[in-house]
């Protein structure tokens, strides 16, 4: 196709030269430069006035044809056509600029290539482009189908403005309307509804829906664990298990609770946390809302109920009202707002959702009857010794404000409350030593306040329950001041009950107290711990007990136990025994203490001790004093040895703690004028050394002593108790007994209620009691199988 044919076709399509000229210029003006239609009309009028004749254009074409034919051999046909049109367009552009007015020349200074592209547009090509544009959306949709993996990521906007999910998956399940990309995924999903499990394990007959589940299960039988932890070397069947395990090393917690924003390392722990905390929280909030609605309806109906007639206490009603107001606010929110605002209700849950439990725990604490008074309470209640009582005391909210002031006034461990006791049950028994130490520092004003009665309680409260509890507290106040975590001997009860008088309950004396140690000059009771002056070592006493209990004489079943409280005919001297002093000598006593009550108490106590002493020593000729006297010891207690010197007394006071720490059988002491006799166990034939004179031992011969004991044994119809002897105990432990005590070198041993005082030989201090062999004079005293090795008084 040459240039002539192309030009002829172009002229025929355009229809006229004038029309062609104007159309080309209009394309340049409107399509490229963007001028208005007014400028386009002006350009058409100028071109129509100065149009070129048809012959000039043909002559120009011939000149171009001759010049281009020379280069046809060197240039290809396509390049030749482009070059020809470019030259032609340049010539026409120059002519147009010359003929147009000066104002339109700048608007026509545009690239000619754009005009050329629009000029040579074919109709068939335009139709092809339209068809491609119609097919393009369908093709793009098919391509998106292939690339789409998860339909959950495609978001659509519904008519109401909410977001929805677009699921382009065509395979839909008939049971649950779930859509899948392929038929394979659909059929695998249908197995869940039908229950079909086509894949079976060859070893354990377990069946699975999918094949990879079967393959993963078979690794359990083969023991294959392909996934290994890099840090600790543990191996796992699944990769997920390994990744979950690695979080324990790294401390990563990727899962977060949507309510409280707490992080967890495993999904199951997140679910458990939601179930335990937040779901139960919602249920309790609903219950509280119902209760709050009932309470508000009662108040609106006009029923006036007193605080005691109301089923709920005041604090509980306040908490419930707070919850009901919170539930009214919650009811105005929808479910989406609830999830966002869960954190706002966390303080409500942590502080006051458990109404019932909080009322039981926070409102009540156990209060032991405390003593914030002086030493007069010990004297008033010396005869009454009760077991510790647990008193439920309702705590007032105002009491916590008075706590620092009360702690400054009294140092009693039970007169104040700690903060930890407010929110829980605090079962605390009275520490006797700390209580007695603090009693010496108490004020007299507090004594007066307590003696006045329930009209002025220690904690001034208008609550009726506090008043009732104060009456109970005053009832047990004296018992608490004389109690040291053991069941002591209740003298007042024993005096009024004959059955108990016949079988006196023995006192289990605590290690932290001594027996009947009261000062006569300064009567501020200060009982100090005896751990530092425990003169008999624990190892010595334990060895003694082991020797008694395991001696190879067929008596292994005899054991010494603290729990054995059925010890008859034994006298209990408690650490709070009152000395026999006149009221003028009682310096620390209260002015309001009744002397008549004290006299009655001492009289009952004396009667009981006299009866018990008569039963234990009714045939004892060495008990010269028929009356009962109380012990008054000197005030040099911490420096006083266990045995006093000989020039003062023959047998002085022996602290019970020196025997208690290593022995299971509790020792009892009997006050007799100015000393204690040693009385233990079940035997009614103990030997109290209870002469009135300090030289009573020299007045009696050894043979008379043995005759008296032998006749005493024969006169009773009671079976003879076996006395265990321990001769091997003398040598290794003689030094602690002999060196640490200033007047006696005897050995002590308890044998089923009897006391034997033994020594390695006749000592210089007690020449009146020589030691002889048992086989000479012991025929009527004991039936021990090891009589040849034991020694006793002769």
UniProtKB/Swiss-Prot annotation:
Identify the species of origin. Answer: Homo sapiens
User: What InterPro entries does its record include?
Assistant: C2H2-ZF_domain, Znf_C2H2_sf, Znf_C2H2_type
Single GO MF descriptor: DNA-binding transcription factor activity
**Phosphothreonine is carried by which residues?**
194
Q: Where is this region: Disordered?
A: 298-336, 574-596
To which protein family does this belong?
Belongs to the krueppel C2H2-type zinc-finger protein family.
On this chain, the residues bearing N6-acetyllysine are 607
Task: Identify the disorder associated with this protein.
Answer: Global developmental delay, absent or hypoplastic corpus callosum, and dysmorphic facies: An autosomal dominant syndrome characterized by underdevelopment of the corpus callosum, mild to moderate developmental delay and intellectual disability, variable microcephaly or mild macrocephaly, short stature, feeding problems, facial dysmorphisms, and cardiac and renal malformations.
List Phosphoserine occurrences by residue: 51, 250, 301, 306, 412, 665, 784
Q: What is this protein called?
A: Zinc finger protein 148
GO BP of this protein: cellular defense response; gamete generation; negative regulation of DNA-templated transcription; negative regulation of gene expression; negative regulation of transcription by RNA polymerase II; positive regulation of transcription by RNA polymerase II; regulation of transcription by RNA polymerase II; substantia nigra development
* Ranges of compositional bias, category Basic and acidic residues: 321-336
Relate the assembly described in the record. Answer: Interacts with HNRNPDL. Interacts with the 5FMC complex; the interaction requires association with CHTOP. Interacts with CAVIN1.
- Where does the record say this protein resides? Nucleus
């Amino acid at each position: 196709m040459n240039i002539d044919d192309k030009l002829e076709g172009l002229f025929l399509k355009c229809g006229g030269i004038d029309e062609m000229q104007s159309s080309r210029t209009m394309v340049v003006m409107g399509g490229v430069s963007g001028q208005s239609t007014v400028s386009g009309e002006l350009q058409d009028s100028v071109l129509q006035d100065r149009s070129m004749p048809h012959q000039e254009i043909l002559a120009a074409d011939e000149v171009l044809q001759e010049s281009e034919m020379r280069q046809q051999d060197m240039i290809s046909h396509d390049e030749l056509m482009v070059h020809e049109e470019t030259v032609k367009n340049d010539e026409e552009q120059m002519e147009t600029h010359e003929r147009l007015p000066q104002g339109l020349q700048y608007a026509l200074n545009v690239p000619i290539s754009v005009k050329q592209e629009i000029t040579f547009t074919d109709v068939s090509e335009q139709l092809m482009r339209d068809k491609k544009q119609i097919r393009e959306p369908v093709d793009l949709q098919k391509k998106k189908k292939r690339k789409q993996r998860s339909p959950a990521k495609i978001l659509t906007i519904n008519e109401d403005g909410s977001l929805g999910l677009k699921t382009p998956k065509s395979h839909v399940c008939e049971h649950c309307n779930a859509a899948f990309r392929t038929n394979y995924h659909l059929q695998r999903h249908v197995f869940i509804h039908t229950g079909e499990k086509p894949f079976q394990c060859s070893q354990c007959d377990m069946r699975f829906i999918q094949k990879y589940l079967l393959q993963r299960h078979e690794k359990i039988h083969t023991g294959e664990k392909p996934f290994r932890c890099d840090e600790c070397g543990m191996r796992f069947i699944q990769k997920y298990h390994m990744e979950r395990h690695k979080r324990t090393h790294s401390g990563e917690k990727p899962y977060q609770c949507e309510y409280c924003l707490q992080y967890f390392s495993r999904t199951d722990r997140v679910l458990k946390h939601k179930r335990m905390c937040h779901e139960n929280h919602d249920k309790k909030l609903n219950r509280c809302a119902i209760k709050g609605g009932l309470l508000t309806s009662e108040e609106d109906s006009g029923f006036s109920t007193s605080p005691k007639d109301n089923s709920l206490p005041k604090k509980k009603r306040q908490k419930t009202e707070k919850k009901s107001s919170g539930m009214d606010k919650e009811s105005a929110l929808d479910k989406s707002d609830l999830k966002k605002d869960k954190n706002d209700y966390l303080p409500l849950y942590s502080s006051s959702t458990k109404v019932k439990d909080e009322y039981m725990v926070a409102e009540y604490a156990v209060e032991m009857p405390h003593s914030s008074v002086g030493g007069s309470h010990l004297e008033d209640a010396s005869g009454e010794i009760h077991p510790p009582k647990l008193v439920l005391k309702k705590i007032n909210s105002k009491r916590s404000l008075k706590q620092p002031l009360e702690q400054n006034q009294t140092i009693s461990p039970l007169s104040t409350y700690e903060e930890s006791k407010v929110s829980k049950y605090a079962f605390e028994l009275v520490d006797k030593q700390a209580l007695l130490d603090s009693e010496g520092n108490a004020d007299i004003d507090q004594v007066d306040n307590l003696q006045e009665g329930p009209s002025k309680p220690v904690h001034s409260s208008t609550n009726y329950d506090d008043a009732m509890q104060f009456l109970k507290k005053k009832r047990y106040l004296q018992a608490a001041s004389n109690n040291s975590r053991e069941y002591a001997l209740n003298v007042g009860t024993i005096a009024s009950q004959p059955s108990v008088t016949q079988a006196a309950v023995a006192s289990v004396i605590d290690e932290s107290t001594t027996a009947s140690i009261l000062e006569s000059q300064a009567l501020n009771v200060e009982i100090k711990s005896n751990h530092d002056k425990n003169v008999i070592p624990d190892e010595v006493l334990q060895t003694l007990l082991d020797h008694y209990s395991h001696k190879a004489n067929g008596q292994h079943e005899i054991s010494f136990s603290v729990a054995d409280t059925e010890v008859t005919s034994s006298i209990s001297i408690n650490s709070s025994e009152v000395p026999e002093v006149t009221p003028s000598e009682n310096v620390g006593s209260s002015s309001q203490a009744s002397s008549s009550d004290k006299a009655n108490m001492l009289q009952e106590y004396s009667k009981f001790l006299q009866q018990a002493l008569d039963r234990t020593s009714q045939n004892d000729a060495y008990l010269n004093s028929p009356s009962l006297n109380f012990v008054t010891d000197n005030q040099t207690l911490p420096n006083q040895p266990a045995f006093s010197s000989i020039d003062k007394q023959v047998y002085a006071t022996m602290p019970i703690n020196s025997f208690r720490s290593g022995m299971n059988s509790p020792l009892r002491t009997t006050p007799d004028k100015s000393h204690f006799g040693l009385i233990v166990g079940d035997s009614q034939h103990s030997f109290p050394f209870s002469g009135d004179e300090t030289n009573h031992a020299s007045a009696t011969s050894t043979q008379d002593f043995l005759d008296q004991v032998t006749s005493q044994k024969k006169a009773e119809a009671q079976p003879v108790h076996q006395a265990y002897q321990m001769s091997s105990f003398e040598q290794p432990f003689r030094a602690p007994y002999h060196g640490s005590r200033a007047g006696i070198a005897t050995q002590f041993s308890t044998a089923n209620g009897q006391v034997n005082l033994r020594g390695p030989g006749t000592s210089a201090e007690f020449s009146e009691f020589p030691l002889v062999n048992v086989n000479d004079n012991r025929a009527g005293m004991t039936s021990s199988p090891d009589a040849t090795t034991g020694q006793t008084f002769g």
